[in-house]
């Protein structure tokens, strides 16, 4: 069966850190970490490729990153600058097609099956877009080209930085069969561990499971895994896709009591990550949810609806503290923590809203 869609996934290379290196020549070639101060409880938003050589990655506690590379340069995020650069990059995309689906400030899908330049080759379009981005904003990007979103997304990550990878219909199945399942887009840590425990290491191993087996193990997600293992993805590029929530969660390396200091430290990191993802998505949120899974696998959630939209770390952390106070101490230890913010709105619509702290001050006067 011949597919006729031409999909490109563009992913900027270490976007925030690359902008900092571009704007400050003294940082070029040095390990740069964008995120919180290592002396506080901040986390890494992103880091340069020089820093990644030390095993540093996003969402890592800044203190851990500092221990791995003490001479790294820590830089506070400049989201207004990142947003401005992102808008210039999107303008480049729109020269080629209106079918652009931004996933965040630094990545997007493009459907160039029919394009404004009347260029038949999607590979040539990807090359031109990469050249345009480098010439106009001074940054490198990586591109994945294929006949669906799933494969294009995987391809863009294969030859970073400044890479271009093509997955054709002819080589897709062979490529997927050899690919480790943890490299499949959308397969997170929990799913990856479940597959590993079942002895499933590659796409071929996954393809050997039938639909009934996958749905029995992964419920609704099983059908998606069944299709992805066969290179099937019918999702369209959606220019007006609405994101419903932003969240972060982690399965703990060892069980903890709810009132332990380490539990609070993990919540600090989760709130930092949610804050980072909110700003990256250019959103405000109005409903906070705390998720807790106990050692016996029972799960509870606590939610809080705010009067005003928020996107700042202090506001998110304060709200989570309020939710935590409503969790009963039941003697059971925690094995998973999660923080989600929903009821989202565009920043443009809510820019003048006051913060949670300002609101609390106003009702106390």
Curated annotation (Swiss-Prot):
GO terms for biological process: DNA-templated DNA replication; error-prone translesion synthesis; SOS response. Keywords: Cytoplasm, DNA damage, DNA repair, DNA replication, DNA-binding, DNA-directed DNA polymerase, Magnesium, Metal-binding, Mutator protein, Nucleotidyltransferase, Transferase. CDD domains: PolY_Pol_IV_kappa (cd03586). Its cofactor is Mg(2+). The active site is at residue 107. Its EC number is 2.7.7.7. The keyword Glycoprotein does not apply. It is found in: Cytoplasm. It is an enzyme of class 2 (transferase). Mg(2+) binds at residues 11, 106. One of its GO terms (molecular function) is damaged DNA binding. Residues 7-188 form the UmuC domain. One of its GO terms (cellular component) is cytosol. Binds 2 magnesium ions per subunit. The record marks 16 as: Substrate discrimination. It catalyses: DNA(n) + a 2'-deoxyribonucleoside 5'-triphosphate = DNA(n+1) + diphosphate. Transmembrane segments: none annotated. NCBIfam families: PRK02406.1 (NF002677), PRK14133.1 (NF010731). Monomer. Poorly processive, error-prone DNA polymerase involved in untargeted mutagenesis. Copies undamaged DNA at stalled replication forks, which arise in vivo from mismatched or misaligned primer ends. These misaligned primers can be extended by PolIV. Exhibits no 3'-5' exonuclease (proofreading) activity. May be involved in translesional synthesis, in conjunction with the beta clamp from PolIII. Belongs to the DNA polymerase type-Y family. This is DNA polymerase IV. It comes from Clostridioides difficile (strain 630) (Peptoclostridium difficile).
């Amino acid at each position: 069966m011949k597919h006729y869609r031409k999909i490109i996934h563009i992913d900027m290379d270490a976007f925030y850190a690359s902008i900092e290196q571009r704007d400050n020549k003294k940082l070029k070639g040095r390990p740069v970490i964008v995120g919180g101060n290592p002396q506080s409880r901040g986390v890494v938003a992103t880091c340069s490729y020089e820093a990644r050589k030390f095993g540093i990655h996003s969402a890592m506690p800044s203190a851990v990153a500092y221990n791995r590379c003490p001479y790294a340069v820590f830089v506070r995020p400049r989201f207004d600058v990142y947003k401005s650069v992102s808008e210039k990059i999107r303008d480049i995309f729109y020269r080629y097609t209106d079918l652009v689906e931004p996933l965040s400030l630094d990545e997007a899908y493009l459907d160039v099956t029919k394009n404004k330049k009347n260029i038949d080759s999607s590979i040539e379009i990807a090359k031109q877009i990469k050249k345009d981005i480098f010439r106009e904003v001074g940054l490198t990007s990586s591109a994945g080209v294929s006949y669906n979103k799933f494969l294009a997304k995987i391809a863009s990550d294969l030859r970073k930085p400044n890479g271009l990878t093509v997955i054709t219909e002819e080589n897709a199945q062979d490529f997927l069969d050899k690919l480790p399942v943890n490299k499949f887009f959308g397969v997170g840590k929990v799913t990856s561990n479940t597959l590993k425990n079942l002895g499933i290491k590659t796409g071929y191993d996954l393809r050997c499971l039938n639909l009934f087996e996958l749905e029995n193990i992964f419920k609704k997600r099983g059908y998606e895994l069944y299709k992805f293992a066969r290179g099937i993805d019918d999702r369209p590029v959606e220019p007006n896709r609405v994101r419903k929530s932003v969240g972060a969660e982690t399965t703990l390396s060892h069980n903890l009591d709810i009132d332990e200091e380490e539990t609070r430290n993990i919540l600090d990191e989760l709130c930092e990550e949610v804050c980072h993802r909110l700003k990256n998505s250019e959103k405000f949120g109005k409903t906070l949810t705390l998720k807790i899974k106990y050692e016996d696998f029972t799960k509870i959630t606590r939610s809080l609806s705010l009067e005003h939209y928020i996107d700042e770390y202090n506001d998110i952390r304060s709200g989570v503290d309020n939710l935590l106070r409503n969790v009963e101490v039941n003697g059971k230890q925690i094995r998973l923590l999660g923080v989600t913010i929903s009821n989202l709105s565009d920043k443009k619509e809510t820019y003048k809203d006051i913060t949670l702290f300002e609101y609390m001050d106003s009702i106390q006067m």
